[in-house]
């Protein structure tokens, strides 16, 4: 009402002029905020990126699994390669001994002893250990009792080894065949 025109209008009985309130239009809102469609497109792009990353990670996991299985398969296939190479020298020595036309018992025996040393060396290099438990306490994990005999030794002591056993590292390859003392 401080405006003189408004004062005149009020005196004349005219209604005062109200200044219209300008509301922002939808176009003005879209200028400042991204539209729903734009937000939706942005979220779709993010979802597609995440899906693509998931597919890549899944494929990489499958590739790693396949390569690991291939490596395991090759390890099984060629695990004995080193040991087999060591045994070839033993085979060669045996063939050479058989090829000699005139042998004496002494030369034959020394050849067999050398071949046995080669075999023992191959066993040692490949962690193949002999189990010869004579005089030891019977161990059912490493020994196989064939029978029990009367003995002056303590009960459950290995008296006789009928066949040596063998272990690879800590695993029994073949248990020793033994006779065990009954006790006093």
UniProtKB/Swiss-Prot annotation:
Cited PROSITE patterns: GRPE
Principal localisation: cytoplasm
InterPro entries: GrpE (IPR000740), GrpE_coiled_coil (IPR013805), GrpE_head (IPR009012)
Gene Ontology biological process: protein folding
One Pfam short name: GrpE
GO terms of molecular function: adenyl-nucleotide exchange factor activity; protein homodimerization activity; protein-folding chaperone binding; unfolded protein binding
Gene3D superfamilies assigned to the protein according to its UniProt record, in alphabetical order: 3.90.20.20, Head domain of nucleotide exchange factor GrpE (2.30.22.10)
Subcellular location: Cytoplasm
Cellular component terms per the entry's GO annotation: cytosol
Stored NCBIfam families: PRK14139.1, PRK14140.1, PRK14150.1
Protein family membership: Belongs to the GrpE family.
Subunit structure: Homodimer.
Matching HAMAP family: GrpE (MF_01151)
Record function comment: Participates actively in the response to hyperosmotic and heat shock by preventing the aggregation of stress-denatured proteins, in association with DnaK and GrpE. It is the nucleotide exchange factor for DnaK and may function as a thermosensor. Unfolded proteins bind initially to DnaJ; upon interaction with the DnaJ-bound protein, DnaK hydrolyzes its bound ATP, resulting in the formation of a stable complex. GrpE releases ADP from DnaK; ATP binding to DnaK triggers the release of the substrate protein, thus completing the reaction cycle.
Protein name: Protein GrpE
Organism: Dechloromonas aromatica (strain RCB)
Lineage: Bacteria, Pseudomonadati, Pseudomonadota, Betaproteobacteria, Rhodocyclales
């Amino acid at each position: 009402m401080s405006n003189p025109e408004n004062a005149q209008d009020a005196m004349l009985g005219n209604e005062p002029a109200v200044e219209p309130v300008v509301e922002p239009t939808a176009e003005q809102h879209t200028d400042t905020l991204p539209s729903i469609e734009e937000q939706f497109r942005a979220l779709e792009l993010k979802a597609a990126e995440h899906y693509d990353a998931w597919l890549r990670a899944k494929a990489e996991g499958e590739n790693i699994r396949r390569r690991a299985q291939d490596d395991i398969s090759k390890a099984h296939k060629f695990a004995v390669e080193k040991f087999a190479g060591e045994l070839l020298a033993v085979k060669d020595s045996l063939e050479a001994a058989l090829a000699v036309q005139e042998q004496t018992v002494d030369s034959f025996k020394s050849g067999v002893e050398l071949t046995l040393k080669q075999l023992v060396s191959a066993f040692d290099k490949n962690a193949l250990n002999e189990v010869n438990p004579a005089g030891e306490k019977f161990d059912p994990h490493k020994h196989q009792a064939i029978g029990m005999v009367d003995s002056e030794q303590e009960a459950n002591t290995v008296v006789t080894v009928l066949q040596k056993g063998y272990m690879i590292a800590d695993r029994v390859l073949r248990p020793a065949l033994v006779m065990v003392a009954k006790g006093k």
